[in-house]
Amino acid sequence: MQKFVKNVKKQTVLLSTRAIAAQIILQVLDQGKSLSTLIPDTQHQVKTQDLPLLQEICFGVCRVLPRLELIIKQLVDKPLKGKTRIVHCLLLVGLYQLLYTRIPAHAAVDEVVNATTALKAEHFRGLVNGVLRRFLREQETLLVKVDKHWHTLHPDWLVNRLKEAYPNWREIVEANNHKPPMWLRVNQQKNSTETYRTLLAEQGIEAEKADNPCALRLLQPVAVSQLPAFHEGAVSVQDVNAQWSALLLAPENGELILDACAAPGGKTTHILEQAPQAHVVALDVEATRLKRVHENLARMQQQATVICGDATQPAQWLKQLSESAVQFDRILLDAPCSATGVIRRHPDIKWLRQASDISALVALQKQILQALWTVLKPNGILLYATCSVLPEENALQIEQFLTNNVDAKLEPLPFTAVEGSVGYQFLPTENGGDGFYYAKLRKVVS
């Protein structure tokens, strides 16, 4: 890695929050790493009270990156490349603070300038100070120049895909550029949704009910430690539209159910909330991510069979089950996808994903669908789900599957959809939830 960048995982001393933010942003932009991996790996390097600021800066920079980049172009004569890229990322941090946080300007500038020392880039101290102070002096004029055109804050390839698919593409882009609300899923084995809402109110936490029977929307986000009985499994944090997975699967006690691509386990635990006596198999190809599944099961006081395996190769992992000639009553396939429906929550997706990724994802989805169909019982249910808004991963994928598999029948869903549509597409413009797609398939008996 570059001279000025510490390996985040090997840091052993506390660094400035701004320095760590710059390192994280550099790794997102130049190495394709995700915030969901980098921030947990670095949070031990900041004071507990500074963690929200670290998250705000990193997610915020990724959310409005093109605007910040345009501003830097106006302020820096020569692009900061190579070993100086970390300084460029530090300027992104500084500009974000000045534009989008309530930190006093003088304090924000001082902290960012001081971060050059932590990054062993002290000789750029004057440049950083000069650029940020010039921005403060010329802010009004600069922003008029930068904002004279409507900016999507999305990569062009994704905007073009959205334009092709949706007449209201601008609304989708606009929704993606806003912070999402915090949604809770109430464990119906412990409390009704209304009862838990009362418990929240007693703690001074306001919440609204939704069409989804398990969901509550917090008017203001809070730390999970503030949620009543969170560590006892009374509630989980999960988007309202993601919560439909277990509800549409409609598991029943005594059934053998596969949660494919299960990590981090939110859907696994919801299935067990709906059917506590079901035998649930949680499968994921990444062993490290299965740790989260175990943690969630422990918090919810539930049991499931957790297996590391490739969903495209059932024969390799079915042997780990005690049942012989295994076939599942129900399968939830939350397929690997572009995650273009959850950009509000993960704005780095805009810069991590490339147009060329989509065809590979579509091919993988097709392969997994076909493989898992072979281990579904006759008359069994497979629920296909993605957190994508791209038709080729969703309706077009299922249309092709139905064409190729005469024993597959599309089941109705309890949503009002466009006549003739295949499955149902939630958009981030609709109900305060993320973009999700669902299609419910039954294996018909010939």
Curated annotation (Swiss-Prot):
The catalytic site is made up of C387 (nucleophile)
Entry's Gene Ontology cellular component terms: cytosol
Top EC class, one word:
transferase
Q: Name one Pfam family in it.
A: Methyltr_RsmB-F
Residues that span the membrane, as ranges: none
Kindly state which reaction or reactions the protein catalyses.
cytidine(967) in 16S rRNA + S-adenosyl-L-methionine = 5-methylcytidine(967) in 16S rRNA + S-adenosyl-L-homocysteine + H(+)
* Cellular localisation: Cytoplasm
Query: Any one Gene Ontology biological process term?
Result: regulation of DNA-templated transcription
Q: Which amino acids does the record list as binding S-adenosyl-L-methionine?
A: C261, A262, A263, P264, G265, G266, K267, D284, D310, D334
Q: Kindly give the InterPro entries that the UniProt entry links to this protein.
A: MeTrfase_RsmB-F_NOP2_cat (IPR049560), MeTrfase_RsmB-F_NOP2_dom (IPR001678), NusB-like_sf (IPR035926), NusB_RsmB_TIM44 (IPR006027), RCMT (IPR023267), rRNA_ssu_MeTfrase_B (IPR004573), RsmB-like_ferredoxin (IPR054728), RsmB/NOL1/NOP2-like_CS (IPR018314)
Q: Name one GO molecular function term.
A: RNA binding
Any idea which UniProt keywords this protein has?
A: Cytoplasm, Methyltransferase, Ribosome biogenesis, RNA-binding, rRNA processing, S-adenosyl-L-methionine, Transferase
Show the Gene3D superfamilies listed in the entry.
Helix hairpin bin (1.10.287.730), NusB-like (1.10.940.10), Sun protein, domain 3 (3.30.70.1170), Vaccinia Virus protein VP39 (3.40.50.150)
EC numbers for this chain:
2.1.1.176
**Annotated SUPFAM superfamilies:** NusB-like (SSF48013), S-adenosyl-L-methionine-dependent methyltransferases (SSF53335)
Query: What function does the entry list?
Result: Specifically methylates the cytosine at position 967 (m5C967) of 16S rRNA.
Q: Which family does it belong to?
A: Belongs to the class I-like SAM-binding methyltransferase superfamily. RsmB/NOP family.
Q: Know the name of this protein?
A: Ribosomal RNA small subunit methyltransferase B
Q: Which organism is it from?
A: Pasteurella multocida (strain Pm70)
* Gene it is expressed from: rsmB
